[in-house]
Amino acid sequence: MSDDATIPITIEFSGGLEILFANQKKYNLSLPTKDESGEPATVAFLVRYLCDHIMKDPRKELFVLDDTVRPGILVLINEADWELEGEDKYQVQKDDHIMFVSTLHGG
């Protein structure tokens, strides 16, 4: 496998997060297999990648806080809570379906 290889994954945003991503709820992405330091791609790298390459809204603080998904955002990896998968240390796999759901709603 070459260093420029990618992993096909599906990303979804819900609960209002799609507003930060050009009002698009679903993305089919080709994520690089390695992060900036040459390590296998993890959810932490995916979050950075989304902020740097996909998010057009300048309000990144509504999605991330201290380099991780901010509290109040549920992350599902293949329909399972990311806490069961190792949270942001989970290594992204081919055809993963990763969903970010805001559980915070205005009144």
UniProtKB/Swiss-Prot annotation:
What CDD domains does the database record attribute to this sequence? Answer: Ubl_Urm1
Query: What's an example GO BP annotation here?
Result: tRNA wobble uridine modification
How would you describe the post-translational modification of this protein? C-terminal thiocarboxylation occurs in 2 steps, it is first acyl-adenylated (-COAMP) via the hesA/moeB/thiF part of UBA4, then thiocarboxylated (-COSH) via the rhodanese domain of UBA4.
Cross-link (Glycyl lysine isopeptide (Gly-Lys) (interchain with K-? in acceptor proteins)), chain numbering? 107
Pathway connected to this protein: tRNA modification; 5-methoxycarbonylmethyl-2-thiouridine-tRNA biosynthesis
tRNA processing recorded as keyword: yes
InterPro entries referenced in this protein's UniProt entry, alphabetically? Beta-grasp_dom_sf, Mopterin_synth/thiamin_S_b, Urm1
GO CC list: cytosol
Which keywords does UniProt give here? Answer: Cytoplasm, Isopeptide bond, tRNA processing, Ubl conjugation pathway
Q: Which residues carry this modification: 1-thioglycine?
A: 107
Q: Which cell locations does it reside in?
A: Cytoplasm
Q: Main site of residence?
A: cytoplasm
Q: Which domain of life is it from?
A: Eukaryota
Similarity-based family:
Belongs to the URM1 family.
Function summary: Acts as a sulfur carrier required for 2-thiolation of mcm(5)S(2)U at tRNA wobble positions of cytosolic tRNA(Lys), tRNA(Glu) and tRNA(Gln). Serves as sulfur donor in tRNA 2-thiolation reaction by being thiocarboxylated (-COSH) at its C-terminus by the MOCS3 homolog UBA4. The sulfur is then transferred to tRNA to form 2-thiolation of mcm(5)S(2)U. Prior mcm(5) tRNA modification by the elongator complex is required for 2-thiolation. Also acts as a ubiquitin-like protein (UBL) that is covalently conjugated via an isopeptide bond to lysine residues of target proteins such as AHP1.
Name this polypeptide is given: Ubiquitin-related modifier 1
Q: What taxonomic lineage is listed for the species of origin?
A: Eukaryota, Fungi, Dikarya, Ascomycota, Pezizomycotina
